[in-house]
C-alpha cells in the first residue's frame, strides 16, 4: 500500500504532463497501424506491386529509427521536448490529410517517411520524459504509455475498415508485369471501350483515384481530425509551463527540471534518484553521444552483452508486431484462406485490440510480477501461437483466435523489457535510446524482409517467418538471462557512494 500511495502521489503531482505524454503516444498508435488494412487500397492508389508498396513500410520504419536516434537532441530541456512533441503530433495530422493525394508510390513513401520521423521523435522524447519524472517508479507509467499506443492502433483500423474497397484491383501474388497487365485490362473494360496492354507501372491513374477518393480518403481525413486535440494538449502544457515566450523560457526550465526531481520521495532507499545531479548528461544524451568511448570506460563485457541481447529481443518482438500488423490482412485475403476483404479488415483491429487489452492487463500485473517473468511468458507465448497458426493454417477461425493470442503476448514485451533492463543497469536515457533504436531497426528490417519473402514464396511463408523470428527472440532472451546472471552488481555500490555524496570516476555511465 505504501508503494501504491507513493505512485498515486507522484501521479497527482504530475497529472497534466503525464496525461499529455500518454495522449502523444495515442498519436503514435494511430500512425503505426493504418498501413496494414489500407495496404491494398494504397496499392491501387499508387499502382504498385507488393514489393514496391513494402518500401512504404521501410521508409516509415527507417525514419522512425532516425527520429528515435535524433530525438535525444530535443530532450535536453523541457521546452525542447514539448516543442518537439507539438511539432511531431501536428505533422502526423498533416500526413493523414495529405496521403489521399499521393498517387505515386515514391511520393507516398516520402510522406510516410515524414510521419516516421515524427513517430521516432515521439517515441524517444515521451519515454524519456516519463522516466525522468518517475525514475524507479516508471514501470507502471510506461505500461500505461504503451497502452495508449495500443488504443490508437486499435482505433486506426476500425476507422479505416468501413472505407476499404471490397474488390481487389490486383490479382494475388503474381509477377509485377502480369499483375499490371491483368489490372489494366480489367479496369479498361469497366471504364473504356477498348483495352490495351500495359507495361509495369504504366497503369492509367483515373479508376484507382476515384475509388480512393470516394472511400479510403475519408478514413485518413477522419484520423487527421481525431489526432488534432493531441498537439493542442501539448500546446496547453507549454502554456502552463510558461514556455511559449522566449524571454521566460530559460529561468523557468530550471524550475521545471527541479520540479521533476522534487516529485521523488525523501526515503533513504530512493536516494538513487539523485543520480541525475551527479551525472548531468547520462539521462540526456542522444544515440550518437551514447556511443562515445568515455561513456563505457571501465564497463564489464556483460554490460555490452546485456545491451546487445536486450536490443535483439526487441528487434525480433517489435519487428514481429509490425510485420504481422502490416501483412496479416494480405495473408488472409489470399489462398488458402481467401477471406473477404471486409472480414479480413477486422484482423488488424483484433490484433491491436488485444495488444491494447494486454497492456491494460499488464498495468496492475506489472506491480506484482517481475518484468523478467513477464518477458519470458510473452516470448514463449509468441512462439507457441505462431506454431499453432502454422499447424492450423487452413482454419479461418483459428486465424482470428491466433491473432488475438499473438496481440496479447506481444502487448507488454517492450515496456517490460525496458523495466527489466532498468532493474539490471539503472537505465537513464542513454540505454533507453539503445532499446528504442533496436526496436525501430527490427520493425524496419522485418517488415521489409517479410514483404519480399511473402511476394516471392507465397502466403505460407508469412507464418514460417513468424516461427523463426519467435524462436530467435527466445534464444536472445535466454542469452540475456545468462548475461544478467554473470553481470557484476555494481549498481548498489554506486548508489551507496552517491548517497554519501561520493562519485566514483571509474564507474561507467548508465
From Swiss-Prot:
Domain of life the protein comes from: Eukaryota
Membrane spanning residue stretches: 19-39, 53-73, 82-102, 107-127, 139-159, 218-238, 303-323, 345-365, 380-400, 401-421, 434-454, 462-482
Membrane topology: Multi-pass membrane protein
SUPFAM superfamilies membership: MFS general substrate transporter
GO-annotated molecular function: transmembrane transporter activity
CC terms in the record's Gene Ontology section: membrane
Major subcellular location class: membrane
Compartment(s) of residence: Membrane
Keyword field: Membrane, Transmembrane, Transmembrane helix, Transport
Keyword Transmembrane: yes
Gene3D superfamilies on file: MFS general substrate transporter like domains
Oxidoreductase among keywords: no
Stated family: Belongs to the major facilitator superfamily.
PANTHER family linked: MAJOR FACILITATOR SUPERFAMILY DOMAIN-CONTAINING PROTEIN 4A, SODIUM-DEPENDENT GLUCOSE TRANSPORTER 1
Protein name (Swiss-Prot/TrEMBL): Major facilitator superfamily domain-containing protein 4A
Origin species: Mus musculus (Mouse)
Taxonomic lineage from the root: Eukaryota, Metazoa, Chordata, Craniata, Vertebrata
Amino acid at each position: 500500500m505504501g508503494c501504491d500511495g507513493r505512485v498515486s502521489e507522484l501521479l497527482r503531482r504530475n497529472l497534466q504532463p503525464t496525461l499529455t505524454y500518454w495522449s502523444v503516444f495515442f498519436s503514435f498508435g494511430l500512425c503505426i497501424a493504418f498501413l496494414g488494412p489500407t495496404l491494398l487500397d494504397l496499392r491501387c492508389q499508387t499502382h504498385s506491386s507488393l514489393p514496391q508498396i513494402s518500401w512504404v513500410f521501410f521508409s516509415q520504419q527507417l525514419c522512425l529509427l532516425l527520429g528515435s536516434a535524433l530525438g535525444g537532441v530535443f530532450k535536453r530541456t523541457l521546452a525542447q521536448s514539448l516543442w518537439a512533441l507539438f511539432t511531431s503530433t501536428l505533422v502526423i495530422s498533416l500526413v493523414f490529410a495529405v496521403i489521399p493525394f499521393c498517387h505515386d508510390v515514391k511520393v507516398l513513401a516520402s510522406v510516410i517517411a515524414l510521419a516516421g520521423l515524427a513517430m521516432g521523435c515521439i517515441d524517444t522524447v515521451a519515454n524519456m520524459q516519463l522516466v525522468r519524472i518517475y525514475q524507479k517508479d516508471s514501470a507502471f507509467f510506461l505500461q500505461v504509455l504503451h497502452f495508449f499506443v495500443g488504443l490508437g492502433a486499435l482505433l486506426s483500423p476500425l476507422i479505416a475498415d468501413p472505407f476499404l474497397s471490397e474488390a481487389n484491383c490486383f490479382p494475388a501474388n503474381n509477377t509485377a508485369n502480369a499483375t499490371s497487365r491483368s489490372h489494366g485490362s480489367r479496369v479498361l473494360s469497366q471504364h473504356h471501350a477498348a483495352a490495351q496492354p500495359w507495361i509495369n507501372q504504366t497503369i492509367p491513374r483515373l479508376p484507382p483515384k476515384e475509388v480512393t477518393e470516394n472511400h479510403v480518403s475519408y478514413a485518413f481525413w477522419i484520423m487527421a481530425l481525431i489526432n488534432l486535440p493531441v498537439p493542442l494538449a501539448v500546446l496547453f502544457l507549454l502554456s502552463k509551463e510558461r514556455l511559449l515566450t522566449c524571454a521566460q523560457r530559460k529561468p523557468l526550465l530550471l524550475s521545471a527540471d527541479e520540479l521533476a526531481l522534487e516529485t521523488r520521495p525523501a526515503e533513504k532507499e530512493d536516494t538513487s534518484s539523485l543520480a541525475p545531479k551527479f551525472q548531468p548528461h547520462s539521462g540526456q544524451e542522444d544515440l550518437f553521444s551514447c556511443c562515445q568511448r568515455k561513456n563505457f570506460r571501465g564497463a564489464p563485457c556483460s554490460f555490452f552483452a546485456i545491451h546487445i541481447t536486450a536490443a535483439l529481443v526487441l528487434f525480433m518482438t517489435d519487428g514481429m508486431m509490425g510485420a504481422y500488423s502490416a501483412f496479416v490482412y494480405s495473408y488472409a485475403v489470399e489462398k488458402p484462406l481467401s477471406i473477404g476483404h471486409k472480414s479480413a479488415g477486422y484482423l488488424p483491429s483484433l490484433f491491436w485490440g488485444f495488444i491494447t487489452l494486454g497492456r491494460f492487463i499488464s498495468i496492475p500485473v506489472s506491480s506484482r510480477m517481475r518484468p523478467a517473468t513477464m518477458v519470458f511468458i510473452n516470448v514463449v507465448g509468441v512462439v507457441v501461437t505462431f506454431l499453432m497458426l502454422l499447424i492450423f493454417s487452413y482454419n479461418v477461425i483459428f486465424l482470428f483466435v491466433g491473432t488475438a493470442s499473438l496481440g496479447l503476448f506481444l502487448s507488454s514485451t517492450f515496456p517490460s523489457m525496458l523495466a527489466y533492463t532498468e532493474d539490471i543497469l539503472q537505465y537513464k536515457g542513454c540505454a533507453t535510446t539503445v532499446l528504442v533504436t533496436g526496436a525501430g531497426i527490427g520493425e524496419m528490417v522485418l517488415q521489409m524482409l517479410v514483404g519480399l519473402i511473402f511476394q516471392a514464396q507465397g502466403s505460407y511463408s508469412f507464418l514460417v517467418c513468424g516461427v523463426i523470428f519467435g524462436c530467435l527472440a527466445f534464444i536472445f532472451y535466454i542469452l540475456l538471462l545468462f548475461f544478467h546472471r554473470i553481470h557484476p552488481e555494481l549498481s548498489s555500490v554506486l548508489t551507496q557512494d552517491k548517497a554519501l555524496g561520493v562519485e566514483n570516476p571509474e564507474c561507467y555511465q548508465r
